[in-house]
Every structure is written in structure tokens, then in C-alpha cells.
Amino acid sequence: MGLQPSPVLLASLGVGLLTLLGVALGAYLVRRSRRPPVTLLDPNEKYQLRLLDKTTVNHNTKRFRFALPTAHHVLGLPVGKHVYLSARIDGSLVIRPYTPVTSDEDQGYVDLVIKVYLKGVHPKFPEGGKMSQYLDSLKIGDVVEFRGPSGLLTYAGKGKFNIQPNKKAPPEARVARNLGMIAGGTGITPMLQLIRAILKDPEDPTQCFLLFANQTEKDIILREDLEELQARHPGRFKLWFTLDHPPEGWAYSKGFVSVDMIREHLPAPGEDVLLLLCGPPPMVQLACHPSLDKLGYSPKMRFTY
């Protein structure tokens, strides 16, 4: 007959196992309790957020800061996603997408950087921007409806992207070691969101390349943020500008996004390459995509916000 374990030994083992389980459960609950509460709990719900502050960024752009429910709340926006703001303006419901320039490391508030398109300034848009003018008219303490997270792209970290071909399709996994980005105007905000997320992780191998197009030098928003990131991570982030109307002595490119600009400043087509585009539709459709076609970037290598 084999030796039978004593009841005392079995009891000791049982107590030890229960102790380990208790410690593990306690650690999990502590970690969970330390997680800040999330604002955007349901992507189909609207959340009213109060305007905290409004500051001027440049001649036509402002930063709007909205309060979250408490000083400990985070927005709850995965990297790659955006929010929708909605308001009833002149009797009509107006909805616009925006990507915050803050992240879930910021508690108690969310910041949006938005160009304010004023009435009677641009001949193609005589009425200006409905939502941007509405936001600019708000007083401190006024509320705006937020909804999200929204969007077809999510960044999971370390070069892993989950991209939905459309809203009803399941996400498809993509791995990109070289991330090229073409942004125009306020299309820079989703790019900055991604760049920050990648560069803050020292173990993320993704290389970032940004081509940022604007009309004039004074139109370049978030330039200081971008140049600071480039200076701190010169081996991981390459930054290039192009202007329609550059000043004398301009050190970067001139004109619309072109084949030569893309060839020189963005990663070449490849299995480990993903190109993201965000900007005015004419720039994206008439300048970017035709140039990418000529250079051999397949549809799988591109994503347009």
C-alpha cells in the first residue's frame, strides 16, 4: 500500500491554496479599484460635458477644454478612436467628429483643438463652419453632448492595429513596423494621438513618419508638440512639413502632397507598412490617393479617417 497523505498535510495545503487565491483576488481588486472611472461607458449614449476653458491657439484655431464628471474621471477613448459632438443649431441637429489632443492619462478633463471657420471668410464656405462657430460662441459653463468611442481603427500597441473595413464588419488585425501618416490642417489630431501613444512606450518598435500639409506657416497647429516629440525621439519619429504658400527661407517642402514628397519622407510600400490619411477631402482624394497609387501602395496598406 502507498503512503496516504495525512489530514494535517491536506489541511495545510488547502489553507495555503486559499491564502494564495485570496492574495491574488485582493491584488486584482486593488488594481481594479485604482483604475479611474470612465466617462464614455456606452458608445450609443450622449454625455453632457461642461466647457471649462477656451484658449486661442493661432489666428483661426482654439483649444476647448471640457470637464469630465469628476476630477478623477478619464474620457475612456481607445487610441485610434474619436468622439462625436452634437448640437441643435438654427433648428437643425449638427454632428461632427473630433479627436481629442488629451489622452486617458489626463483625468478630469478632455481637450479639443478646433479650427473655427467664420462666416464670410472663405468664398467656398460663405456660412462658415456650423459646429466650430457654435463652439466658439459657448460661454464657460455651457454644456455640449459627446458620444463615443467611435471609429474603425484601434491601436492595440507595439505596432498592432485592428481595422474594420466598415462599421458592420469585424476588425482585421494589421501589424505595422513602419507607420506613415499624411495629415492636412486639423487632420493632425488623430495622428498626434497615435504618435504620442507609440512614443511613450519604449518597447514599441513602430517607426513613425509624418507628412503634415498646411496652407501657410501660421496655419500649422500643434507644431511645438510635434517638434518636441521629434527632438526627444529622433530615431523613432520623422517629421516633415509642406505649405501651399511658404515664407521666404522655408526649410521644408512647397505645394500639394506629391509623389516625390511621399517617396522621400514616408516609408516605401511593404508588408510591414501602414499609411494613415486625414485631412480635407480634396487633399486626400485628389492629391494623396493618386500619388499612392503611382507608388504602388495597395489598398491594404492605407487607412483614411
Swiss-Prot record:
It is a single-pass membrane protein. Residues 44-156 form the FAD-binding FR-type domain. Its main location: membrane. Its cofactor is FAD. One of its GO terms (biological process) is sterol biosynthetic process. It is found in: Membrane. GO terms for cellular component: membrane; mitochondrion. It is an enzyme of class 1 (oxidoreductase). Keywords: FAD, Flavoprotein, Lipid biosynthesis, Lipid metabolism, Membrane, NAD, Oxidoreductase, Steroid biosynthesis, Steroid metabolism, Sterol biosynthesis, Sterol metabolism, Transmembrane, Transmembrane helix. CDD domains: cyt_b5_reduct_like. Its EC number is 1.6.2.2. PROSITE patterns: FAD_FR. The keyword Repressor does not apply. It catalyses: 2 Fe(III)-[cytochrome b5] + NADH = 2 Fe(II)-[cytochrome b5] + NAD(+) + H(+). FAD binds at residues 136-166, 175-210. The chain crosses the membrane at residues 8-28. SUPFAM superfamilies: Ferredoxin reductase-like, C-terminal NADP-linked domain (SSF52343), Riboflavin synthase domain-like (SSF63380). One of its GO terms (molecular function) is FAD binding. NADH-cytochrome b5 reductases are involved in desaturation and elongation of fatty acids, cholesterol biosynthesis, drug metabolism, and, in erythrocyte, methemoglobin reduction. Belongs to the flavoprotein pyridine nucleotide cytochrome reductase family. This is NADH-cytochrome b5 reductase 1.
